[in-house]
Swiss-Prot record:
Contains one covalently linked phytochromobilin chromophore. This is Phytochrome A. It comes from Oryza sativa subsp. japonica (Rice). Residues 1-24 are annotated as: Disordered. Residues 620-690, 750-834 form the PAS domain.
Length: 1128
C-alpha cells in the first residue's frame, strides 16, 4: 500500500490513526468475505486460495456492507455458549430472567438426593426471579454486586443453589439492556472458598509478577520469554506463546515455551485474517478468553420472545467460539486454550497527557498482542486463576509500554546522531555525493537493503539497488504519476501501480523517496518481507502435499508468505520523519539563494534567548535560596567534596546542630554510622548526575536533642549545577519521618488501641486508610478526609480497588490504568505478606485537584499472626517542598528550552552557511587572481571553524575538562591559521584604530605541521579578540612566535610552538583571567567562557596559557604541541 507524503505533512500519530482506521475497515471487510465463504462451502472452504485473493482484490470489490453487518452481528450476538457453565440474562429493574441457556435449569435447579427438601423446587424459565434460586449469603452478595455501577467489580461471587446445594462462581457483566451472569461450577476441593473479588487472585500470580517486576528492562525478548515461562508454570498448559501484532496487523509468535515433544511455532508469521478484527475488538472488551474443549457441543440460548435485540455475549466468559476457529484448533491438535489480551498505549507523541489531567482524557489503547496457552486435552481453569492470569497480562502490558518508551528514546537518539553526521558531511562537501560515497551514508539513516541518488543527471547506487536504467525509469514514473508530491513511501511498488515492478523481482518491493528538487532524488529500497522471516518450526517435507483446505499453522505461514510475496516491511512514521528531515537539510544545502533576513531573525532570537534565560535564571536562583532558608522541611546541601554548605533552620531545629556548627563539616560526620554507606552511595551517584529519590537515612542529634535519638529523614537528592551544567554539589530535600516511625512502632506494639491513633485529629498523624483481607475499605481517618474531600462514611465498606480508587469510575481517580495496576501490586503484595517499599502515588481528590504523595503500605496482623488487612500511610510534601520541586522543574524546563533553542540554531545556521559555501565555491571557478583566491580561502577557514564550534553543541559539556572535544590530526600550514585568526578581529581593530602587527618568521609560517589547525585557529582568534577588546583606542596588538623541534624519529619531530599576543593598555581584568582558570565559576561571562574553552583545548593539545603584565603592556603566552611533516 503506497502513500505519498505532501510537503506540509500531518503529525505521525495522526497519520498512523488514519491509516490504522482504513486498514481495520479493509481487514474487517475481508474477514466478512472469508466468513461468508466458510459458511457457504463448509468442508470445501479453500483458506489458502481466499487469503491469497486479498492481494489481487481491490477494496471496492471487497465492499459488501450487508455481509460485514451480518458477520459482526453473528460474532457478537451468536446464541451459543460453551457447556462448562450456564448463563442467565436478567432484566436490570426486576432481576427476572429474560434469557437462559438450555442447560441452566439442569445445572441450577436439579434436586440433589443428598439435600432433602419439603418444598417444591423452583422452576427456572423466562420470567423467574433470580433471588429464588440461591441461598444466603450468596444471594445477598450477588444482589450487592448487581447494585454497583460496575457490576463486575466483585467477580467472582460465590453462590449456592437452593435445590442442589451446588456451589457456583457467578460472573456478572452488563450488556445492552440487561445483566448477563455466567455460572461456573466450583470444584469440591475449592469449596468453601473466599470469593472477594480481584484481591484474592493476586496471590496466585504473586511470584510471576515479582519476577517480571525484577527484570532490568531494555530487552523486549527477555520480557516476553519471562512472561510465557511464568504463565507456563502458573497454568500448566502444554504450550504458551506470546503473539505480537505488527503494524500491518499480521501476527508473529514472538516467544514460546512447550512441553517436550511438541512442534515449535516460534518465529511463525501468520496473516492478519487468522485473528479477525472483530475478534480483536472482543479481546479489547473482554481481556481473557477460555475454550475448554473445542470438540464439545455448544449450548443454545433461549430468549424472551418480546426482546427487540438478541442478547450480546461479548463480555461472557462462556461465549462459544466460531466454528471456523474450532476447526483450526482441531487441526493443530489444540483441544483447549486460554488467551489473554495485551493492551498498551498508542504511540502519540503529539497528544501527550499532562499529569494533572483526569483519567477520562488518557491515551488511546491498542492491542499489542496476545498471551496464548494451548493444551492437547480438555482443560478448565477456574475464574480466580484466570483473573490472576489477566492481572499478570496487565503487569506485562505496563512493562511493554516501558520498553516501547525506551526503544523510542534510543531510536530517536540514533536517528538524530545519524542526521547530525550526515548534515556535517553535507556542510563539508556542499554536495549530496558525500552522503552516498562516505561513511556513514544514507543507508544508515533507516533500515533498508539498498539506496540510490539521482543527482545532476547521474546515478549513484548502494548495495541492493535497482540498475541505473531501472532507477531512471522509476524517476520518470514519479515525475509522471506523483508529480505534485515531494516524496513517496510504499511497501509494494506493485500495489502502488509502478508498471516495472515485476521486472524488479522480489529483491526490490518497497521504496521510500525524497525529492530534493524536480530532478534530484534520493531513494531507499527494501526487499520482500519473506526475506526477513525464518520460521523455526519443523521443516516441511517437499514430497508431502499440503491440503490447502486444512487450516493449520503451516498453511497460515504459507498464506502469509503469499500475501507478502510482493511486499516489504512497511515504512514506519519515524523513519519517514527522518527521511523528510534529511530532505529539508539537502534542500537548504543546495539552495544558492541566501536569505539575509534569516540571519537577522536568528540574531534576534539569540538575543531574546539570552535576556529571557538570564532573567529566569536569576529569578530561580533567588527563589531557591529563599525557599531553602525559610522552608518548613529539612533541606541540606554539600559541595562536590561532601562538605556541608547548606543547613536550613528546620534541620538545625530537628538535630540541635546550629547552622554555623554544621557548615564546613563533612556530611558523613553528621549522619549515623549505619547510614554512612547509604549516604556515600547517594552522594557518589548525585555527583555523576544520577539523582536518587526516597532514600532513608538517619542524622545524629546534638545538644538538647541528643537524648531524643536520631532524626529519620526520607531524602530526594538534587544535583546542583553551575551555568555550564557541571555538577558542583548536591542538595538534599527531606521529609522528617521520625514521627511516622513512632506511629508505626506504636501500631506494631499496641493491640486494640490503633483506632485511637488513626482517628486522632493531631496534625502529626498522617492520612491513613486501610482495607480488610477481602479488599473492603475498613479505615479512613480524619486526615484522609481532609486530603481527599471524601468523608469516612462515603468510602467505608466499599471496594478499595475499584470503588474508592480506580482509573475510570471511583471516588478518587488515579491517573491511568498503569497507575491503577501499580497500586494493585503494592496493596496485594502487602496482603500476600511481602515487604513493600514506599512508592510514589497520585490521584484526583473530590474537587479534581491532583494530589502527589508517597504511599507506604503495611500489613495488619491479628494476635495469631494472620494477615487481616492492610494499613496505608500517605505522606504529602509540604507546600514549601512542593513549591521547591516546582521551581526545580521550571529550572529544568528552562534548561530544556535552551537546549531545544541551541538545536534549532545549529540547524538554522547550517543552511545559510551552506549557501555561503556554495557561493565561495562558485567564486573559485570565476578565474580569481592569487590575492582574491587568498581571501576566499580565509573565508573557507573561518567557515570550518564555525562548523567545528557548532558541532561542539553535541557534546555533553564543552567546559568539562574530561569531555572529549574532537581533535583532528591533519596537515596544515601555520600561515593559513594566523591569517584566518587575524581576519576575525580586523573589523573591530579598524573601529578602534588599533594596529595589528605580526612578528612571524617566514620559515615558521611556511612550515607544514600536523595537528588540529581549525582548533588552533579558534584558540588564537579568541585570545586576539580579548586582547583587542581591552586595548585602548589607537593602541597596538603584536603577535610573535617561537618554535622548537624535538626529534622522535628519522623524519618525525615534535614541535613546541609558543605564541605571544602582546597589547597595550591596562590589560585584561583580573576577574576575567580568574574565569579562564576556574571552570566552575558560577558568574562566568561570555569572554570568560570563551577563554576557558580555549584553555581546555590548549591542554588537550598538551599546552597551556599564561598571562603577564608589565608597564603599560600585557601578554598572553600560549604553548601548544604539534608534529612536523616528514621531510620531502
Amino acid at each position: 500500500m503506497s502513500s505519498s507524503r505532501p510537503t506540509q505533512c500531518s503529525s505521525s500519530s495522526s497519520r498512523t490513526r488514519q491509516s490504522s482506521r482504513a486498514r481495520i475497515l479493509a481487514q474487517t471487510t475481508l474477514d466478512a468475505e472469508l466468513n461468508a465463504e466458510y459458511e457457504e462451502y463448509g468442508d470445501s472452504f479453500d483458506y489458502s486460495k481466499l487469503v491469497e485473493a486479498q492481494r489481487t482484490t481491490g477494496p471496492e470489490q471487497q465492499a459488501r456492507s450487508e455481509k460485514v453487518i451480518a458477520y459482526l452481528h453473528h460474532i457478537q450476538r451468536a446464541k451459543l455458549i460453551q457447556p462448562f457453565g450456564c448463563l442467565l440474562a436478567l432484566d436490570e429493574k426486576t432481576f427476572n430472567v429474560i434469557a437462559l441457556s438450555e442447560n441452566a435449569p439442569e445445572m441450577l435447579t436439579t434436586v440433589s438426593h443428598a439435600v432433602p427438601s419439603v418444598d417444591d423446587p423452583p422452576k427456572l424459565r423466562i420470567g423467574t426471579n433470580v433471588w429464588s434460586l440461591f441461598t444466603d449469603p450468596g444471594a445477598t452478595a450477588l444482589q450487592k454486586a448487581l447494585g454497583f455501577a460496575d457490576v463486575s467489580l466483585l467477580n467472582p461471587i460465590l453462590v449456592q443453589c437452593k435445590t442442589s446445594g451446588k456451589p457456583f462462581y457467578a460472573i456478572v457483566h452488563r450488556a445492552t439492556g440487561c445483566l448477563v451472569v455466567d455460572f461456573e461450577p466450583v470444584k469440591p476441593t475449592e469449596f468453601p472458598a473466599t470469593a472477594a473479588g480481584a484481591l484474592q487472585s493476586y496471590k496466585l500470580a504473586a511470584k510471576a509478577i515479582s519476577k517480571i517486576q525484577s527484570l532490568p528492562g531494555g530487552s523486549m525478548e527477555v520480557l516476553c520469554n519471562t512472561v510465557v515461562k511464568e504463565l507456563f508454570d502458573l497454568t500448566g498448559y502444554d504450550r504458551v506463546m506470546a503473539y505480537k501484532f505488527h503494524e500491518d496487523d499480521h501476527g508473529e509468535v514472538f516467544a514460546e515455551i512447550t512441553k517436550p515433544g511438541l512442534e515449535p511455532y516460534l518465529g511463525l508469521h501468520y496473516p492478519a485474517t487468522d485473528i479477525p478484527q472483530a475478534a480483536r475488538f472482543l479481546f479489547m472488551k473482554n481481556k481473557v478468553r477460555m475454550i475448554c474443549d473445542c470438540r464439545a457441543r455448544s449450548i443454545k440460548i433461549i430468549e424472551d420472545e418480546s426482546l427487540h435485540l438478541d442478547i450480546s455475549l461479548c463480555g461472557s466468559t462462556l461465549r462459544a467460539p466460531h466454528s471456523c476457529h474450532l476447526q483450526y484448533m482441531e487441526n493443530m491438535n489444540s483441544i483447549a486454550s486460554l488467551v489473554m489480551a495485551v493492551v498498551v498505549n498508542e504511540n502519540e507523541d503529539d497528544d501527550e497527557v499532562g499529569a494533572d489531567q483526569p483519567a477520562q482524557q488518557q491515551k488511546r489503547k491498542k492491542l499489542w498482542g496476545l498471551l496464548v496457552c494451548h493444551h492437547e486435552s480438555p482443560r478448565y481453569v477456574p475464574f480466580p486463576l484466570r483473573y490472576a492470569c489477566e492481572f499478570l497480562a496487565q503487569v506485562f502490558a505496563v512493562h511493554v509500554n516501558k520498553e516501547f518508551e525506551l526503544e523510542r528514546q534510543v531510536r530517536e537518539k540514533s536517528i538524530l546522531r545519524m542526521q547530525t553526521m550526515l548534515s556535517d558531511m553535507l556542510l563539508r562537501e556542499s554536495s549530496p555525493l558525500s552522503i552516498v560515497s562516505g561513511t556513514p551514508n544514507i543507508m544508515d539513516l533507516v533500515k533498508c537493503d539498498g539506496a540510490a541518488l539521482l543527482y545532476g543527471g547521474k546515478v549513484w547506487r548502494l548495495q541492493n539497488a535497482p540498475t541505473e536504467s531501472q532507477i531512471r525509469d522509476i524517476a520518470f514514473w514519479l515525475s509522471d504519476v506523483h508529480r505534485d508530491s515531494t516524496g513517496l513511501s510504499t511497501d509494494s511498488l506493485h500495489d502502488a501501480g509502478y508498471p516495472g515492478a515485476a521486472a524488479l523481482g522480489d529483491m526490490i518491493c518497497g521504496m521510500a523517496v525524497a525529492k530534493i528538487n524536480s530532478k534530484d532524488i534520493l531513494f531507499w529500497f527494501r526487499s520482500h518481507t519473506a526475506a526477513e522471516i525464518r520460521w523455526g518450526g519443523a521443516k516441511h517435507d517437499p514430497s508431502d502435499k499440503d491440503d490447502s483446505r486444512r487450516m493449520h499453522p503451516r498453511l497460515s505461514f504459507k498464506a502469509f508468505l503469499e500475501v507478502v510475496k510482493m511486499k516489504s516491511l512497511p515504512w514506519n512514521d519515524y523513519e519517514m520523519d527522518a527521511i523528510h528531515s534529511l530532505q529539508l537539510i539537502l534542500r537548504g544545502t543546495l539552495n544558492d539563494d541566501i536569505k539575509p533576513t534569516r540571519a537577522a531573525s536568528l540574531d534576534n532570537q539569540v538575543g531574546d534567548l539570552k535576556l529571557d534565560g538570564l532573567a529566569e535564571l536569576q529569578a530561580v536562583t533567588s527563589e531557591m535560596v529563599r525557599l531553602m532558608e525559610t522552608a518548613t522541611v529539612p533541606i541540606l546541601a554539600v559541595d562536590s567534596n561532601g562538605l556541608v554548605n547548606g543547613w536550613n533552620q528546620k534541620v538545625a531545629e530537628l538535630t540541635g546542630l546550629r547552622v554555623d556548627e554544621a557548615i564546613g563539616r563533612h556530611i558523613l560526620t553528621v549522619v549515623e554510622e549505619s547510614s554512612v554507606p547509604v549516604v556515600q552511595r547517594m552522594l557518589y551517584l548525585a555527583l555523576q548526575g544520577k539523582e536518587e529519590k526516597e532514600v532513608k537515612f538517619e542524622v545524629k542529634t546534638h545538644g538538647s536533642k541528643r537524648d531524643d535519638g536520631p532524626v529519620i529523614l526520607v531524602v530526594n537528592a538534587c544535583a546542583s549545577r553551575d551555568l555550564h551544567d557541571h555538577v558542583v554539589g548536591v542538595c538534599f530535600v527531606a521529609q522528617d519521618m521520625t514521627v511516622h516511625k513512632l506511629v508505626m512502632d506504636k501500631f506494631t506494639r499496641v493491640e486494640g488501641d490503633y483506632k485511637a491513633i488513626i482517628h486522632n485529629p493531631s496534625p502529626l498523624i498522617p492520612p491513613i486508610f486501610g482495607a480488610d483481607e477481602f479488599g473492603w475499605c475498613s479505615e479512613w481517618n480524619a486526615a484522609m478526609t481532609k486530603l481527599t474531600g471524601w468523608h469516612r462514611d462515603e468510602v467505608i465498606n466499599k471496594m478499595l480497588l475499584g470503588e474508592v480508587f480506580d482509573s475510570t469510575n471511583a471516588s478518587c481517580l488515579v491517573k491511568n490504568k498503569d497507575a491503577f495496576v501499580s497500586l494493585c501490586i503494592l496493596i496485594n503484595s502487602a496482603l500476600a505478606g511481602d515487604e513493600t517499599e514506599k512508592a510514589p502515588f497520585s490521584f484526583f481528590d473530590r474537587n479534581g485537584k491532583y494530589i502527589e504523595c508517597l504511599l507506604s503500605v503495611n500489613r495488619k496482623v491479628n494476635a495469631d499472626g494472620v494477615i487481616t488487612g492492610v494499613f496505608c500511610f500517605i505522606q504529602v510534601p509540604s507546600h514549601e517542598l512542593q513549591h521547591a520541586l516546582h521551581v526545580q522543574q521550571a529550572s529544568q524546563q528552562n534548561a530544556l528550552t535552551k537546549l531545544k533553542a541551541y538545536s534549532y540554531m545549529r540547524h538554522a545556521i547550517n543552511n545559510p552557511l551552506s549557501g555561503m559555501l556554495y557561493s565561495r565555491k562558485a567564486l573559485k571557478n570565476t578565474g580569481l587572481n592569487e590575492e582574491q583566491m587568498k581571501e576566499v580561502n580565509v573565508a573557507d577557514s573561518c567557515h570550518r571553524q564555525l562548523n567545528k564550534i557548532l558541532s561542539d553543541l553535541d557534546q555533553d559539556s564543552v567546559m568539562n575538562k574530561s569531555s572529549c572535544l574532537d581533535l583532528e590530526m591533519v596537515e596544515f600550514v601555520l600561515q593559513d591559521v594566523f591569517v584566518a585568526a587575524v581576519s576575525q578581529v580586523l573589523i573591530t581593530c579598524q573601529g578602534k584604530g588599533i594596529r595589528v602587527s605580526c612578528n612571524l618568521p617566514e620559515r615558521y609560517m611556511k612550515q607544514t605541521v600536523y595537528g588540529d589547525g581549525v582548533r588552533l585557529q579558534q584558540i588564537l582568534s579568541d585570545f586576539l579578540f580579548v586582547s583587542v577588546k581591552f586595548s585602548p583606542v589607537g593602541g597596538s596588538v603584536e603577535i610573535s612566535c617561537s618554535l622548537t623541534k624535538n626529534s622522535i624519529g628519522e623524519n618525525l619531530h615534535l614541535i613546541d610552538l609558543e605564541l605571544r599576543i602582546k597589547h597595550q593598555g591596562k590589560g585584561v581584568p583580573a576577574d576575567l583571567l580568574s574565569q579562564m582558570y576556574e571552570d566552575d565559576n558560577k558568574e562566568q561571562s561570555d569572554e570568560g567562557m570563551s577563554l576557558a574553552v580555549s584553555r581546555n583545548l590548549l591542554r588537550l593539545m598538551n599546552g597551556d596559557v599564561r598571562h603577564m603584565r608589565e608597564a603599560g603592556m600585557s601578554t598572553f603566552i600560549l604553548s601548544v604541541e604539534l608534529a612536523s611533516a616528514p621531510a620531502k
